[in-house]
From Swiss-Prot:
Pathway the protein contributes to: Pyrimidine metabolism; UMP biosynthesis via de novo pathway; UMP from orotate: step 1/2
Role summary: Catalyzes the transfer of a ribosyl phosphate group from 5-phosphoribose 1-diphosphate to orotate, leading to the formation of orotidine monophosphate (OMP).
Description of how the protein assembles with itself and partners: Homodimer.
NCBIfam families: pyrE
Residues holding 5-phospho-alpha-D-ribose 1-diphosphate: 94, 98, 100, 120-128
Keywords assigned by UniProt, alphabetized: Glycosyltransferase, Magnesium, Pyrimidine biosynthesis, Transferase
GO terms classed as biological process: 'de novo' UMP biosynthetic process; pyrimidine nucleobase biosynthetic process
InterPro entries, A to Z: OPRT (IPR023031), Or_phspho_trans_dom (IPR004467), PRibTrfase_dom (IPR000836), PRTase-like (IPR029057)
Keyword Transferase (UniProt): yes
One Pfam family here: Pribosyltran
Protein name: Orotate phosphoribosyltransferase
Amino acid sequence: MKTKIAKHLLQIKAVSLKPDEPFTWASGIKSPIYCDNRLTLSYPEVRHDIAEGLKELILTHFEGAEVIAGTATAGIPHAALAADRLNAPMCYVRSKPKAHGKGNQIEGAVSKGQKVVVVEDLISTGGSVLEVVAALQEAGCDVLGVAAIFTYGLPKATAAFQEKNIPYVTLTDYDTLTDVALELKAIEPSAMNKLKRWRQDPSSESWMEETV
């Protein structure tokens, strides 16, 4: 599954790799990779495989899940598709409460004590999805963990999830994707060193330097 989803993401250009012309993230980080999983919704086969994959992840790793929660906004459609396949209730969670109306942060019916799995499209540092987890926990839910399409596998994310004692699983990951990209000739072999060095310390720009 990891290889299949990685190929999908590369072939539809949901993931772009440019180690020699790095992207600038909103945080200011210079990155050789950019991921836009919203594109997956436009491709029925890809969308189907992601939904089936998320269903299997949830059944395998989060036994007893009662509610599927999507992160606003990118996680919502994938949560809905997975919940439909699981015949489970679904809700979604904003990063912060609405400033008007009822001021809801959680939209949908969810009750105290219910076992919830959060669906996210992408895990970078883990900060935003863990805010969603915290909101659900504050509402009295038992959050079993997070299921996502892709993770960069950053050390910061691993540490953040461990600190909160929240497990997470993904359909594919950075190592798989870069290996598949090399196989598909989407990157040159010489680029692999830069890609590995960036992942070790994304906040440093030393990965962009040429090494002998």
